[in-house]
Amino acid sequence: WIMGHMVNDLEMVDYYVDKGANGLEIDITFNSNGIAEYTYHGVPCDCFRNCRRNTTLSTYLNYVRQLTTPGDQKFRQNLIFIIMDLKLNRLKSQALFNAGLSIADRLTQYYWKDDGKARAYFLLSVPYVRQAAFIRGFQSRFEEKGLKKYYEKIGWDFSANEDLNRIREAYQKLNISGHIWQSDGITNCLTRRTRRLKEAIRKRDSPGWYINKVYSWSLDRYKSIKYALDLGVDGVMSNYADRLVKILSKGTYKRRFRLATHEDNPWETFTP
C-alpha cells in the first residue's frame, strides 16, 4: 500500500494517483463544535511541502467518489484506500463525539450517496486513545442511521505513537477487534528509531493480537523506504509515491512485494 502524504486538494489527488499511489492520506480539520469542514494541515508540516493546500471536505469527498466509482468517466482503478488523519487535538469531549457524528454524516452525504457504488476503503486515524469519544460518536451514528453495511469499508488507527498495549486496551473497551492498522512514524524533517515499528510488526504476526496491518510514515529517502520494506511493513506513507513504485519494480523487492489492488482486503493480515 502506497499512501501519498498530505493530499489536501484536488490537484494533489491527481498528482499522487498519477505517480502510482493506491492510497491517499488527507488531513481533516474541525470547528470548535466538532463539525468536519476542510482538508487542511497547516503549519508546521513536512519539509519541502506546501502546508496550506486545502479544500472543503464535501468537495473532496465528491471528487474521490467519482475517482473510485467504476463506470464513472473519472474512474481511476488504482485508487482504493484513503486515510483520514483526524485533527482532533483541540476538541473537548463532547466535540470529539460530535466529530465522529460529523465524519459519518459527511461520508454518507458525499461519498456513499450513490448507495455505496464508490469502492474505496477508509482508515479513520485518531491521534490519541484519550480521543476515543470520536469513535463512539462515529459508531453511534452508524447505529442510528442503519449504516452497518458500510463498516466493511471502515478501518481504525491510533497514530500518535502511543504504547501498543494501551492501544490494545482502548480497542477492547470500544469492542473493536478487526479492521485495525497500526501506524508508526514522524515527520520527514526528522529521523525516528524503529523499536516500536518492529514491535508492531511482531504483534501483527502474533496470534491473539489486534493488529491487521502496519504502516510507516513519512518515508521519503530510498534507504528508509527499503529498510521499512525489509522489516515487513504492509504500507508506506510518503511525499514521493513514485519512489516506492520504482523500488517495487526492481530486484528482490519486485520478487517479494506487489502493489495492492482492490481485490486485496486491507483488513486481513497477510500470510505468505
Swiss-Prot record:
Keyword set, alphabetical order: Cytolysis, Dermonecrotic toxin, Disulfide bond, Hemolysis, Lipid degradation, Lipid metabolism, Lyase, Magnesium, Metal-binding, Secreted, Toxin
GO biological process: killing of cells of another organism; lipid catabolic process
Disulfide bonding pattern of the chain: C45-C51, C47-C189
InterPro entries in the cross-refs: PLC-like_Pdiesterase_TIM-brl
GO CC terms of this entry: extracellular region
GO MF annotations, alphabetized: lyase activity; metal ion binding; phosphoric diester hydrolase activity; toxin activity
Cofactor list: Mg(2+)
Tissue specificity comment: Expressed by the venom gland.
Record field: catalytic activity: an N-(acyl)-sphingosylphosphocholine = an N-(acyl)-sphingosyl-1,3-cyclic phosphate + choline; an N-(acyl)-sphingosylphosphoethanolamine = an N-(acyl)-sphingosyl-1,3-cyclic phosphate + ethanolamine; a 1-acyl-sn-glycero-3-phosphocholine = a 1-acyl-sn-glycero-2,3-cyclic phosphate + choline; a 1-acyl-sn-glycero-3-phosphoethanolamine = a 1-acyl-sn-glycero-2,3-cyclic phosphate + ethanolamine
Catalytic residues of the enzyme: H5, H41 (nucleophile)
Binding-site list for Mg(2+): E25, D27, D85
Subcellular location: Secreted
Cofactor binding mode and count: Binds 1 Mg(2+) ion per subunit.
Enzyme Commission (EC) number: 4.6.1.-
Chief place of localization: secreted
Entry's family note: Belongs to the arthropod phospholipase D family. Class II subfamily.
Function: Dermonecrotic toxins cleave the phosphodiester linkage between the phosphate and headgroup of certain phospholipids (sphingolipid and lysolipid substrates), forming an alcohol (often choline) and a cyclic phosphate. This toxin acts on sphingomyelin (SM). It may also act on ceramide phosphoethanolamine (CPE), lysophosphatidylcholine (LPC) and lysophosphatidylethanolamine (LPE), but not on lysophosphatidylserine (LPS), and lysophosphatidylglycerol (LPG). It acts by transphosphatidylation, releasing exclusively cyclic phosphate products as second products.
Name used for this protein in its record: Dermonecrotic toxin StSicTox-betaIF1
Organism: Sicarius terrosus
Top-level taxonomy: Eukaryota, Metazoa, Ecdysozoa, Arthropoda, Chelicerata
